[in-house]
């Protein structure tokens, strides 16, 4: 039996005909990846400057991670948490020691990790802080992106995320991002019923919005002054992406809870987790939260390998060094379509000046033709986030492509 070889156009048409229309991809059909590169079905090579929204920090198909995946897949994939397995405990030990927390609660997607953190925060609020049941509040920031579930879109200020999905989950207070005075006002007025604040140290989907220096520390201090948990959503910013293990590390902040995902598996499986100390984590007991796949042997084995790659190959340090080069060089672009560049480490964004009918989407199409893949967020911002394994030589080649495209518009 022979397998039909589809053309790129046919593959796009298959998705259009048989798949839900909840994404608007660039018209590129990929079939292979290695390191910082991906290849389409026609054999064309591209720099990957999206990294699956920072899930592929270790590069595509990293041999160590793939080897761990294949070895465990031949041995045991799934048991559920009804039984112990020989992979989860070693993973939890390695991860908690590496990240510096008492406990890890394994989940699958980033949204699941966030939902888990919200449940833990409310449980802590009732059992430890003494908030009257069903009255706990959680503070969120405008412009956030924490996931797509009903509860999480309740927290969103983006109509595309929450429009016509109501009614929404109560118990959230939204304040402007990067505004500690707004946080102080809410805590002064309602702090006795606030169990937590959840925030992204850098807002990725909002356009790699980097808050003012000291913002995260100010939020942390205000929360602790009111006996409120500080939760950092590091699903996109964590695991080396910003040039530190966690983006919060730039300000010396150790959150009460951290959500992680994406690069936790090196882009091979949906693997996420919540990190917290015993006071928070042990408020949930057996049967009170769980996941069939959370912590399954395959995920545990892959996560250990993925974290070892980050640590042993010094990818965090590489992100810090090359991020400076990227921003310095991109800032030199001479084009009326270029406005500014911002970011930390290898999580960066270019703010464009749409004009003459050319927006960020059109620029991304031109970048793809030149062999570099990036994706716009909103109409005027392009996120650039290559795998952290990128070399300086590769980075400078990619910068050349970006400069050429902007300066030829």
Regions found by a protein language model. Name each.
Residues 1-409:
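Conserved N-terminal phosphate-binding loop of PLP-dependent enzymes in the Aspartate aminotransferase
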